[in-house]
């Protein structure tokens, strides 16, 4: 009798333990499933990490475990990593959703608000310290509250998002380049481990079997994603803001293109409006405006109210380039030429378009005193140590010492020096057919 009772208790206890185990297993399974389906609220930067601010977009990490490119990679597809792929896909999905939603901030009635005669588009990478200086200069600009500023990003960063969340002085829209290296870290348009090394000879590349062996650039080098991205981003952005940004659907004004390391003068908007009026009245043949030059001007006296008409040159007039819709439409007709010309610089490629594809070379209206300055003394084309505070202090000193000459009442055209230029020397870095086809595809994308 005692044995039976003991056996019954053992059986009951066994069933209880089994039931508890099943419940626990089911609970963990559901939790894992839910975690897999929910967007990961991780830090925005894979290495450093940072917290998100209330009201900011969810901060999501790419979550990539990078393979080293320093060692020889096998010429076969990497083993699938579902967890990493899922994180990357969610990140891409977030960018797609934000580009679709196009949340406009700092306007009273979103449904009825329309931009005025100028929109700024700022191409942003990852240099938060320079972006902060640009934002500080925009805050000081007279009339900026009437100007929509669109920030076009190719790098997701909580720090940068927080800087832009702090912009309360003008309407703001953020869009995101959907084919960035950050979104495609181990495959094209990022760096695929099966890509050919930059300096490998073509014959050796063909023997090696790397996937872009057939497509070195004009100088025998293979693509480097970090250099290709800037040209991709610029062309995608050009098309996206004119064709896909909803609030600009019927926009008839100009778009002024800036970069994160630019710095604007307090009277840049004032001067822009007067330049636009002058262009319409006295220079209808002018194709574009440029508010920035690299000319060093110590004193604004006698020149702050002067503008010139010149042949557009990429090395002089690529900063603060302002385009009309008509100028954009002529550019976009040259998509094939832009996307296949072997130069990784967007501005040098534009220079080539002005002598090869556009109906005529560009004439640009440009002030003798720049209203947009280049604060970035380091970056893709420079090897200097970044000193953003030093650069901004120098610009501020220049502006403060000449403030009595700013905000001119009228502008006059001082000289007209226009002549067709010879085709520029290409710089290479854009020989890969994958870059060509992706670049050409932007016109077809949503």
Curated annotation (Swiss-Prot):
Plays an essential role in protein N-glycosylation. Catalyzes the transfer of N-acetylglucosamine (GlcNAc) onto the free terminal mannose moiety in the core structure of the nascent N-linked glycan chain, giving rise to the second branch in complex glycans. This is Alpha-1,6-mannosyl-glycoprotein 2-beta-N-acetylglucosaminyltransferase. InterPro entries: GlcNAc_II, Nucleotide-diphossugar_trans. Pathway: Protein modification; protein glycosylation. Its EC number is 2.4.1.143. Residues 30-446 are lumenal. Belongs to the glycosyltransferase 16 (GT16) protein family.
